[in-house]
Amino acid sequence: EPAAAEAALKTCEEIDKLESDADRVMRSAMSKLFREEPDVREVIKLKAIYELLETITDKCEDVANLIEGIVLENS
């Protein structure tokens, strides 16, 4: 169905934009963390959390790319 395929592609594009935004936010947060957090233990904990969030957003983008490929292949 063309409308469903178009909607899926639009959603995939939005996910790609959101992942790029998340990358920028993560870089900024990481920079601020190293500049401003005096407690080394807190830096280590937050850095690990930020990296996990980055992994999650990357995986979401990977799924969107797979869906996009499937939609394009079948349209």
PLM regions and their residue ranges:
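Cytosolic, long alpha-helical scaffolding segments
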Residues: 1-75
